[in-house]
């Protein structure tokens, strides 16, 4: 029971705010490799095994909202961009993994000022996060790792 309480206390330090967190009974090296493979469809910007940090570069895509304002006008493009951050941490007998997507939309605010024409944060895509988490789970299951 004390081990479980200790694990839960440590998990708060090991996760990213708002992330999808999981714990695996598996070696750090195996989980690290699986985490890296799980985001291989995106360009990697940071890959620091010692710190347990993987960050992808921004990828741009068509936005989900098409118009704005009372007249439902097109703004300065309908673009979104996203990047993934994966944190892998050693915790006693388990390894934790936190997956978080940062997503932004171009020019959602009205006006023509410099302040209105920039990337604005929006909610992450649960589907994109789930895709990475499911890939990770599948890869670790193939290697015999147990989720705890």
Q: Which stretches of residues belong to each language-model region?
A:
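Ser/Thr-rich, low-complexity intrinsically disordered terminal regions
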Residues: 14-148
């Amino acid at each position: 029971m004390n081990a479980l309480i200790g694990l839960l206390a440590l998990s708060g330090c090991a996760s990213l705010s708002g992330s999808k967190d999981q714990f695996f009974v598996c070696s750090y090296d195996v989980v690290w490799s699986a985490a890296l493979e799980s985001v291989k469809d995106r360009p990697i910007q940071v890959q620091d095994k010692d710190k347990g940090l993987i960050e992808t570069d921004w990828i741009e895509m068509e936005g989900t909202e098409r118009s704005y304002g009372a007249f439902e006008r097109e703004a300065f493009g309908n673009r979104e961009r996203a990047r993934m951050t994966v944190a892998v941490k050693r915790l006693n007998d388990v390894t934790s993994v936190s997956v978080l997507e940062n997503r932004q939309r171009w020019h959602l605010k009205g006006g023509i000022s410099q302040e209105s024409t920039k990337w604005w944060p929006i909610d992450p895509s649960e589907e994109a996060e789930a895709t990475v988490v499911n890939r990770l789970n599948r890869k670790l299951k193939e290697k015999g790792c147990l989720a705890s």
